UniProtKB/Swiss-Prot annotation:
EC number: 7.1.1.-
A GO cellular component entry from the record: plasma membrane
Gene from which the chain derives: nuoD
Organism: Thermus thermophilus (strain ATCC BAA-163 / DSM 7039 / HB27)
TM stretches of this protein: none
Function: NDH-1 shuttles electrons from NADH, via FMN and iron-sulfur (Fe-S) centers, to quinones in the respiratory chain. The immediate electron acceptor for the enzyme in this species is believed to be ubiquinone. Couples the redox reaction to proton translocation (for every two electrons transferred, four hydrogen ions are translocated across the cytoplasmic membrane), and thus conserves the redox energy in a proton gradient.
Subunit structure comment from the entry: NDH-1 is composed of 14 different subunits. Subunits NuoB, C, D, E, F, and G constitute the peripheral sector of the complex.
Compartments, as annotated in UniProt: Cell inner membrane
Record keywords: Cell inner membrane, Cell membrane, Membrane, NAD, Quinone, Translocase, Transport
Chief site of localization: membrane
Family: Belongs to the complex I 49 kDa subunit family.
Catalytic activity: a quinone + NADH + 5 H(+)(in) = a quinol + NAD(+) + 4 H(+)(out)
PANTHER family, sorted: NADH DEHYDROGENASE [UBIQUINONE] IRON-SULFUR PROTEIN 2, MITOCHONDRIAL (PTHR11993:SF10), NADH-UBIQUINONE OXIDOREDUCTASE 49 KDA SUBUNIT (PTHR11993)
Name of the molecule in the record: NADH-quinone oxidoreductase subunit D
């Protein structure tokens, strides 16, 4: 759309009159392949000069039909699909799905397995926030912090590789526990990392919050008031930056989070600055949680002993026919949760992540619905961008921290 008003105004006219010489309203495409959109996101942007009048997100470019596919796979097979939605905090999807199925089954997760889940989930949250911090500051024109953030993230990925064998898409959490126990070298290496990380977080906050350039670029930009944030369904750091104290780990505790001591960082203005600062401070809380978890990491089993849920150890397959039968049924037919429906919310790096699962008594879910925080948070983009400048729109997108695999699914 383009509108022009071409009035004959003298070239020596005063500035307030010269502004009316030519006014244009243009609609442009940003994306779907554009570095500032943090994925395959297409934005229809209506501009008046540099001012953003309207932003309409167009999604679906990364749609893979995860939810429908999961309805045609057994509950165990679906574990391979869940980490591929939010590939930056994949442990969050693994955990949320496992908790929902365990609620259907009435499975009992051993204390050691719960603690391992918390440790890996918070490490994954740290890794995700480091990507957010590095790429967010990169969008504001700062190249060096990007390398600083990825330095620590590389250490976390090394820890994941020791435990799961994978740096991404870990497939480590299982229904009723975790795949296997932690390797011997994991805890000592994790403690070394935890000694360094608090100082790094202090450096990140100083680099960001104390920089007058970042302050001018981020403060007062993309403001989302608390009442608007609630109406739009925002969760996670984007909601807490607006001053709303809501964290699923506190409101609806799971995996023993109610027994951990940690704070919920809040913002004051709900702008780009607060959304970035809240996530930096959340990293400190994740370190606190991991340290507490290490102190209570007692020896014990890591899977529910129920043979209907957990396959038998491989060494029993050579001596026990009963173990062979359970093993065969587990990997061919799977288990059959009773009829019912559950919704389990969790706190991912991007906000409330929930799995709604309906069971008809079969070995496959009748319905799976994922409450993905990136999808919900993205709908605040038109409100946050209206009236801002084009370069600020890039910063606003980064501050919402969307993952397009989480949006499209």
């Amino acid at each position: 759309m383009r509108e022009e008003f071409l009035e004959e105004i003298p070239l020596d006219a005063p500035p307030e009159e010269a502004k009316e010489l030519r006014t244009e309203v243009m609609t442009l495409n940003v994306g779907p392949q554009h570095p500032s959109t943090h994925g395959v996101l297409r934005l229809m942007v209506t501009l008046s000069g540099e001012e953003v009048l309207e932003v309409v997100p167009h999604i679906g470019y990364l749609h893979t039909g995860f939810e429908k596919t999961m309805e045609h796979r057994t509950y165990l097979q679906n574990i391979t699909y869940t980490p591929r939605m939010d590939y930056l905090h994949s442990f969050a999807h693994d955990l949320a799905y496992a908790l929902a199925v365990e609620k259907l089954l009435g499975a009992v997760v051993p204390p050691r397995a719960e603690t391992i889940r918390v440790i890996l989930n918070e490490l994954s949250r740290l890794a995700s926030h480091l990507v957010f911090l590095g790429t967010g500051l990169l969008d504001l024109g700062a190249l060096t912090p990007f390398f600083y953030a990825f330095r620590e993230r590389e250490t976390i990925l090394d820890l994941f590789e020791w435990v799961t064998g994978q740096r991404f898409h870990h497939n480590y959490i299982r229904i009723g526990g975790v795949k296997e126990d932690l390797p011997e070298e994991f805890v000592p290496e994790l403690k070394k990392f935890l000694e360094v990380m608090p100082h790094r977080i202090d450096e990140y906050e100083a680099l960001f919050a104390e920089s007058p350039i970042f302050y001018e670029r981020a403060r007062g930009v993309g403001v989302i008031p608390p009442e608007v944030a609630i109406d739009l369904g925002l969760t996670g750091g984007s909601l807490r930056a607006s001053g709303v104290n809501y964290d699923v780990r506190k409101a609806y505790p799971y995996s023993g989070y109610e027994t951990y001591t940690f704070d919920v960082p809040l913002g004051e203005r709900g702008d780009v600055f607060d959304r970035m600062l809240v996530r930096i401070r959340e990293m400190r809380e994740s370190v606190k949680i991991i340290k507490q978890a290490l102190e209570r990491l007692e020896p014990g089993p890591v899977r529910d002993p129920n043979p209907q849920i957990t396959p038998p150890p491989r060494h029993l397959l050579e001596t026990s026919m009963e173990a062979v039968i359970y093993h065969f049924k587990h990997y061919t037919e799977g288990f059959h949760p009773p009829k019912g429906e559950v919704y389990v919310p969790t706190e991912s790096a991007r906000g409330e992540l929930g799995y709604y699962i309906v069971s008809d008594g079969g070995s496959m879910p009748y319905r799976v619905k994922v409450r993905a925080p990136s999808f919900v948070n993205l709908q605040s983009l038109p409100y946050a961008c209206k009236g801002e400048q084009v370069p600020d729109m890039v910063a606003i997108i980064a501050s919402l921290d969307p993952v397009m695999g989480d949006v499209d699914r």
